[in-house]
Amino acid sequence: MNTIINVGRQFGSGGGYVAQAVGKKLGIPVYDNELLCKAAEESGYSKSIFEGGEQRKSLFSMSSFFSSGRLGFGETGYVNDDMLFKIQSEVIRNIAEKGDAIIVGRCADYILRDLDCLDVFVCAPMEYRIQRLVQNEGLDPDEAEALMRRKDRTREAYYNFYTFGAWGKADNYDLCIDSSILGIDGTADCIIDFGRRAGKIR
């Protein structure tokens, strides 16, 4: 049985960094941007067609990205986000079947709901997230707050649309953890300890 950890996160909480820290400590590959590359490669499209997959729900042109005519899309050059979600879901399932993996976002907890995964949601207080964005991205506090709220809204809309669930709601996860309490490394250690105690990290 493979160890699969799905990590959802509030924007600015450092959830992506936490996932990377968990992966480094356990020697497990982390799929975030790498997932986009793999999805694009396996479906015959440029990586850029998957960028922002969690950030939108719309119909858009594929003509500048179309490369192989695979998946039966023909020469129309158009495909909607529902098709892209299906492709992405297949890629995520393939990753989970092939070996241990940590998957960041992308509704992976829902896509892999029939497997014995560890589903984690990383959150943090607004003030902490704003501070991180100011320090790491060079934004002023107002810009950081506006960006944070916008990203969280779009992630929530994307997740709720495809899963019929509630993004960030505790019942959807095995563990919800505030990264501001222990920091990135301490949060990663806590997730690993919890996962081992729960029998989900093997």
Name these PLM-found stretches:
Residues 40-100:
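ATP-dependent small-molecule kinase phosphotransfer cores
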Residues 29-41:
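Short beta-strand-centered segment that lines the nucleotide-binding/catalytic pocket of NTP-utilizing
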Residues 106, 110, 126-127, 139-140, ...:
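Long, contiguous binding/interaction regions
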Residues 6-23:
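Glycine-rich phosphate-binding P-loop
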Residues 2-4:
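Extreme N-terminal starter segment of soluble prokaryotic enzymes
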Residues 114-151:
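Conserved phosphate-donor/acceptor-positioning beta-strand/loop module used by diverse small-molecule
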Residues 60-65, 140-185:
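Small-molecule kinase domains that catalyze NTP-dependent phosphoryl transfer to phosphate-bearing small molecules
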